[in-house]
Amino acid sequence: MTSISAKLRFLILIIIDSFIVTFSVFLGYAILEPYFKGYSIDLLVLSSVILLVSHHIFAYVFNLYHRAWEYASVSELMSVLKAVTSSIVVTLLLVSLLISESPFLRLYFITWMMHLLLIGGSRLFWRVYRRYFIDNAVEKKATLVVGAGQGGSVLIREMLRSQDMRMQPVLAVDDDKNKQKMTITERVKVQGYVEDIPELVKKFRIKKIIIAIPTLSQKRLNEINKICNIEGVELFKMPNIEDVLSGELEVNNLKKVEVEDLLGRDPVELDMALISRELTNKTILVTGAGGSIGSEICRQVSKFDPQKIILLGHGENSIYSIHQELSKTYGNRIEFVPVIADVQNKTRILEVMNEFKPYAVYHAAAHKHVPLMEYNPHEAIRNNILGTKNVAESAKEGEVSKFVMISTDKAVNPSNVMGATKRIAEMVIQSLNEDNSKTSFVAVRFGNVLGSRGSVIPLFKNQIESGGPVTVTHPEMTRYFMTIPEASRLVLQAGALAQGGEVFVLDMGKPVKIVDLAKNLIRLSGKKEEDIGIEFSGIRPGEKLYEELLNKNEIHPQQVYEKIYRGKVDHYIKTEVDLIVEDLINNFSKEKLLKIANR
């Protein structure tokens, strides 16, 4: 059953209350008519009009038109008493001032009684009707809410009001000891801490848990997820309460907890002042701007109010999409320029540099699909190595201040074409970082990003939706994971810290077993592992069981910021690197590529 809209509900209550107020006055008159001699009808009409106006004013003041009356309790009925009494007192005082006759007090007493009984009764009637006739007709699942703050309270009241959510809030838990035993509504109280959830789930037969604490730590979220995994309970997150209060999102816009939420980490506090100096009122160029990382870098850069962002990419559809998105959100204060260009075409790239003269370049354009590049090594070399060389040399010729290359953990001791090409691309930009250069060149290296195109998570999700099985290459295979927004924010921070020549390595946290990731995705999709199944297909060409973040020459990294490390790197001579690149393009062999990348 669809809930009545707020405006229609407000109008219905005004009409009902207007009828009740008028009826109360005339009913009082009918009861007291034998005693009403000597009083004019003007008193009756005037009393009705003043009481009607004052009732609506006090009903608004005491919030009678915006409460969830279907779950009214003592506090709601006290508001009715205050509104009714206040309106009667005001009416009595105004009538005394406006007419010469002394008010008939018995009339106002009877009117007050009828007014109170009928207004309160109308609200209680809706509560009874809703609970016994509507609620019983809709199956609602027992729900536990984590968090008894403002967000949790708003969410619980909305669940009680809404039939569409199909959730019945039973209790809340909160780690704040001051909130223990606190009553949120007549039917929902705080009955423990997060650690009590397993016991409470069994006791109250909980089917759903909703996280209503936006600042809940990653550790706590994973603990709750493990409980849900054991007990077979669905886990959701409510939207940020600020977005709810601003009207941007509805409180019932719940989101199932995804694997990205579980593998994410508590956010790093960025040095906003330092990054602002690098980005605010500047022209920024992002290559690969339509890709997963490139588009998120554009979003993050936009938050610092640059003057202009050049969105450069080879795929017209993805560039069009990110241009539309950013123009809609930030177009009133930032100029976004979509540029279709191939990084393999140096003449075109140099034209772009000379035309827009960017302050900084974030180079995210790359082929990153490991198995696919094993079949297309020449294209990987041209795009990842030659493309990086073209963009970096053009940036140097255009006297760009900062050049930040997005690299990968697969560039460390690479065993595949993709990783090897990214490692040599790092060598290219390190060779360009000369003492007399006006451009500072830096690489930022990190692992897999969650949800990026071609990554394992979308693949697993598709396999689960198709009924399985989920294919994992090896039971011991591990990977580092990071969310796209976190990686992009840390890229901006590393770029702001760069002096030139560094390879920055992002702290990826603990490596995750791919088989455990698959199991988590199956459970979060509401399926059972035995129904979907997991098959081991064997390691594919170029894959490693585990990834590294530093090679043997880069050990003992220096931490320069939270979750950002600077690896010790060697300097490369540009003429030698140029010869290596030319030789790989003209005389390719995989053995040669891997040998150079691993030296």
Curated annotation (Swiss-Prot):
It is a multi-pass membrane protein. Pathway: Capsule biogenesis; capsule polysaccharide biosynthesis. The keyword Transmembrane applies. Its main location: membrane. InterPro entries: NAD(P)-bd_dom_sf, Polysac_CapD-like, Polysaccharide_Synthase-Rel, SAM-dependent_MTases_sf. One of its GO terms (cellular component) is plasma membrane. The gene is capD. One of its GO terms (biological process) is capsule polysaccharide biosynthetic process. This is Capsular polysaccharide biosynthesis protein CapD. PANTHER family: POLYSACCHARIDE BIOSYNTHESIS PROTEIN EPSC-RELATED (PTHR43318:SF1), UDP-N-ACETYLGLUCOSAMINE 4,6-DEHYDRATASE (PTHR43318). It is found in: Cell membrane. Keywords: Capsule biogenesis/degradation, Cell membrane, Exopolysaccharide synthesis, Membrane, Transmembrane, Transmembrane helix. CDD domains: UDP_invert_4-6DH_SDR_e (cd05237). Belongs to the polysaccharide synthase family. The chain crosses the membrane at residues 12-32, 41-61, 79-99, 102-122. Signal peptide: none annotated. It holds the Pfam family Polysacc_synt_2. It comes from the Bacteria. The keyword Transmembrane applies. Required for the biosynthesis of type 1 capsular polysaccharide.
